[in-house]
């Protein structure tokens, strides 16, 4: 959790880093009393590893510029508390208006979440004024397409109407296979959609096969098997051919020989003012939703000048939260239900400029600039090309056809900037049958098998709910890829195109489950909170909070000695000698009885008290924290994790700060969340050299502004 901080002797919370620091407390939509479902892999460790790679890249960039090394402090806890998978935006929600997110029942949101179909399950999201009318026509309910009862937030639609629509939806789904339902939803309703696939489905899918997503590697002990090939593709500095896993001690002599050689001499640059690693790098940002903006947030945090290019003639999807503005009363009603995935407003008040006040957007908009231009028009493209000529990097994560129609592909921009680095982050890549499929992280994770493997072993996919770990990982890996491309350009003068398919980027995280299929032909199935060799390995209920809310602790026992210590702390030492639980093998064979026995005992304890008692005995455990508990975490407070930041519209709010520390590169949030068009004058006049007359023409044609054009934002009468 980071050195020298208030939680001493903490063994890694092996399966619940995402619970103690992140959003596991919200996962799983089963009936009250059922444990949360963890991610389907050791996600916190992998995500922390990706953060470590990015942090190392930042340190290398600094070293190459100054000759000075650095010390990097990464806390797995911090990486989860700051993750885009709901933890960071939900903490911003809480700062804005006190929302405490809650778990909710499966199927409770209209046209969203996992549903059964003819040959399995799909996850389709078709809510909102952009998609819902087309969705209703698609499922045979055209008479409801303009129904005013559906203009309220999805969670406030009358239950009778929801049930009526869901019945038609069910009938439609049961006449279609997974592939058919996803394809028709994508093509007819432009819905966000993905199948919930098994490892077998994934490995056999022609989309990934055609894109070269698998790599056959031979090993002397396991033979040839297919592995995930690469998280992203770099056109000018491709990843070397993967090598097999080494045998134990295979390279000892080679490493010792290299270690005996003198280190290369490095010339330190003259001492000067403190600089962040990416100072002087200009990044043009055409990103939407979460993964892309998160990538550019990380780059901006470490010094890059990130300029968002945003239209005022239309609302970008799921970005500034302005597709449809709710009233203050509607916001408060949704907040009282613990539901605010799309963000909320300070004190629930949308104000005059709700697009600047959305907590979801603002949680990743710090340290950035904003200019406005409609790049789908000739004038807007001309301005965009002029900006690109001054830039180092362009980042986008749109549906590929959107970028192609706007004529801002890498090939079309090269004449304006031959050394440009362009990062493209589509859901499923720039080629293949799924190229133009629309998806959020949760739909991508369904398509690649993560939703399947993280489900409850005895349950159904709708019960495990939605997670957005793909967005978080995509943002981190995208920033890392850009950092590597910048190093390559510094050495060679060569820019390049980086293609980061968010689906393929996640495949290495599922390596264990994928290799179980490719090596053994074994489907691991939904794993819930189970572990192959550890028991107990579960989230257990503890004493409810003072206001009656559920409270949970994750416990991970690897050895019989740890189990004995657990039993003593729980006041039931006799359990350790019970024949059903005396050995790990016995506990794994009697999991239901074990979980029932341990859960009955943990209910008597406060989760924080039990956490500290178990840690003091060497038992890996961690409380599943709510948003308010993370805000008041003495550990995060001691590490200076939260920062109080101002913005003219949303005021002073608390946000998660940077989540690793470099000893010789101190870093804080330097600028509050950027407002729409806030930097138009600077970008157009100073950077691009527009004259007063040129600038006036763009203003008159509706490109330049700080509010959306008349009629673009849909407001209810009383908003």
Task: For each feature predicted by the language model, list its residue ranges.
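N-terminal helix-loop segment corresponding to the beta1-alpha1 unit
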Residues: 1-65, 179, 247, 251-491, ...
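Glycine-rich beta-alpha junction loops
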Residues: 1-2, 76-81, 119-121, 127-131, ...
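Conserved Rossmann-fold dehydrogenase catalytic segment
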Residues: 3-5, 33-42, 64-80, 102-105, ...
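Oxidoreductase and adenylate-handling cofactor-binding alpha/beta cores
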Residues: 25-27, 31, 49-70, 86-95, ...
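A short glycine-threonine-serine/GTX helix/turn-capping micro-motif
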Residues: 36-47, 102-103, 110-112, 121-123, ...
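Nucleotide donor/acceptor-binding cores
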Residues: 70, 279-281, 496, 551
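Terminal low-complexity tails and localization/encapsulation signals of metabolic enzymes
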Residues: 109, 116-117, 197-282, 525, ...
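Aromatic-enriched alpha-helical interface/lid elements that frame and gate functional surfaces
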Residues: 110-189, 206, 536-617, 621
């Amino acid at each position: 959790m980071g050195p020298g901080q208030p939680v001493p002797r903490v063994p890694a919370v092996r399966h619940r880093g995402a619970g103690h620091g992140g959003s596991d407390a919200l996962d799983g939509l089963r009936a009250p009393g059922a444990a949360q479902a963890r991610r389907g892999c050791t996600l916190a460790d992998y995500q922390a590893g990706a953060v470590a790679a990015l942090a190392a890249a930042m340190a290398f960039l600094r070293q190459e510029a100054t000759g000075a090394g650095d010390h990097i402090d990464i806390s797995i806890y911090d990486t989860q508390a700051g993750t885009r998978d709901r933890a960071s935006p939900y903490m911003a929600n809480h700062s804005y208006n006190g929302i405490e997110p809650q778990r909710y029942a499966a199927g409770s949101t209209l046209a969203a979440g996992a549903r059964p179909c003819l040959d399995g399950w799909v996850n389709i999201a078709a809510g909102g004024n952009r998609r819902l009318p087309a969705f209703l026509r698609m499922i045979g309910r055209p008479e409801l397409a303009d129904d005013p009862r559906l203009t309220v937030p999805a969670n406030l639609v009358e239950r009778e109407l929801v049930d009526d629509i869901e019945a038609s939806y069910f009938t439609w789904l049961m006449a279609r296979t997974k592939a058919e339902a996803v394809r028709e939803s994508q093509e007819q309703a432009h819905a966000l959609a993905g199948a919930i696939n098994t490892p077998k489905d994934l490995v056999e899918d022609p989309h990934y096969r055609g894109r070269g997503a698998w790599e056959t590697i031979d090993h002397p002990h396991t033979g040839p098997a297919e592995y995930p090939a690469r998280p992203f593709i770099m056109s000018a500095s491709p990843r070397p051919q993967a090598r097999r896993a080494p045998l134990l001690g295979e390279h000892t002599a080679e490493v010792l020989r290299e270690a005996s050689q003198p280190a290369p001499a490095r010339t330190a640059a003259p001492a000067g003012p403190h600089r962040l690693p990416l100072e002087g790098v200009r990044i043009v940002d055409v990103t939407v939703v979460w993964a892309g903006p998160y990538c550019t947030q990380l780059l901006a945090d470490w010094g890059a000048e990130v300029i968002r290019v945003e239209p005022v003639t239309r609302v970008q999807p799921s970005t500034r939260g302005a597709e449809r503005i709710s009233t203050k009363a509607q916001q408060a009603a949704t907040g009282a239900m613990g539901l605010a995935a799309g963000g909320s407003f300070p004190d629930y008040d949308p104000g005059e400029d709700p697009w600047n006040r959305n907590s979801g957007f603002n949680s990743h908009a710090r340290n950035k600039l904003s200019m406005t231009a409609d790049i789908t028009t000739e004038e807007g493209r001309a301005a965009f090309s002029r900006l690109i000529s001054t830039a180092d990097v362009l980042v986008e994560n749109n549906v590929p056809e959107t970028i192609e129609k706007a004529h801002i592909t890498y090939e079309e921009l090269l004449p304006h900037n031959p050394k440009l680095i362009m990062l493209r982050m589509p859901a499923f890549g720039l080629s293949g049958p799924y190229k133009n499929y629309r998806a959020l992280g949760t739909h991508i994770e369904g398509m690649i098998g993560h939703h399947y493997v993280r489900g409850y072993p005895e349950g159904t996919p709708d019960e495990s709910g939605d997670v957005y770990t793909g967005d978080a990982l995509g943002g981190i890996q995208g920033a890392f890829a850009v950092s590597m491309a910048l190093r390559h350009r510094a050495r060679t003068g060569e820019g390049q195109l980086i293609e980061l398919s968010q689906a393929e980027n996640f495949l290495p995280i599922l390596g264990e489950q994928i290799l179980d299929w490719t090596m053994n032909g074994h489907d691991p199935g939904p794993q819930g909170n189970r572990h192959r060799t550890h028991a107990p390995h579960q989230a257990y209920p503890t004493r409810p909070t003072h206001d009656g809310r559920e409270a949970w602790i994750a416990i991970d026992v690897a050895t019989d000695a740890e189990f004995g210590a657990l039993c003593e702390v729980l006041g039931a030492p006799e359990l350790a000698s019970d024949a059903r639980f005396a050995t790990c093998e016995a506990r794994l064979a009697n999991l239901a009885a074990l979980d029932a026995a341990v859960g009955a005992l943990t209910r008597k304890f406060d989760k924080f008290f039990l956490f500290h008692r178990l840690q003091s005995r060497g038992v890996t455990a961690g409380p599943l924290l709510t948003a308010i508990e993370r805000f008041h975490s003495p550990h995060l407070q001691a590490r200076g994790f939260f920062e109080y930041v101002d913005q003219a519209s949303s005021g002073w709010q608390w946000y998660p700060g940077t989540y690793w520390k470099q000893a010789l590169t101190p870093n804080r949030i330097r600028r509050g969340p950027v407002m729409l068009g806030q930097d138009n004058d600077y970008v157009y006049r100073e950077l691009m050299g527009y004259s007063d007359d040129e600038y006036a023409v763009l203003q008159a044609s509706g490109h330049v502004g700080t509010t959306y054009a008349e009629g673009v934002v849909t407001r209810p009468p009383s908003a």
